[in-house]
Amino acid sequence: MIAPEALKALLMNNQVIPVKFAGHRMLLDAGGVLLWPQQDLLIFSDLHLEKGSFLSQFANPLPRFDSKETLKRMHLMMQRYDCGHIVCLGDSLHDGNALSRMQIDDLERLNTLVDSVAKWTWILGNHDPDIPPEILGKRAPLLQIQNVLLVHEPEVLAIVNENAINENCALDSQHVPVEAQIIGHYHPKSSYKLANRKVTGKSFVCGDNILLMPAFGKYTGGLDINDKAFEHMFTRKSALVYLTYHQKIYLL
């Protein structure tokens, strides 16, 4: 885990902002990751590895180096926080054939990252409902940690809790109700007028019981937080938006 002195420096430099979500203290990093110190957990979302090679098949003039860059940035974030558990919130691969296009050294680099921590969980997404066995790590459709659900797309929590209660009754065990969820999928971005210019960046969005992660992948765009797609999750007035820009993070 990151040393207190190093964390203090990040906080003073506006690279990290502390938040309280679902009763837990967490840290949002300008690099697009979430740290849950109490759980020794670092969360990434929407890596979209091999998106460049996918698009280049359709005459899009994009270089095929996005996976290298994404993995390099992942390594830096992992070195920064030194957590024992990594969770990737779905769409880690851009498509079902991503592995066939991935360069051998990139696959080796990915597996080296996975093998460097005690636990690595791939949450499955709509782009990667199956992750090939050549990639190390555990697969799961969702993951509950205490009262928080980690999942790619938002779930109806009442249904999640009902299903869990039924399963736990069969096992004669006690269920901790899910009260909030951390999700990916939407690639939220926001904008802010600064002097004579407007800055736009990937963003975290924190509502009452839902926290949206920004996309981490190199070639991942964003959906403006004012888009109607977000209306069923939160209202703009009720949500806290954290804009990332040039390795800084700001509460709007």
Task: For the regions a language model picked out, list residue spans one by one.
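Extended recognition/assembly regions associated with phosphoester-bond processing machinery
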Residues: M1-L89, H94-L252
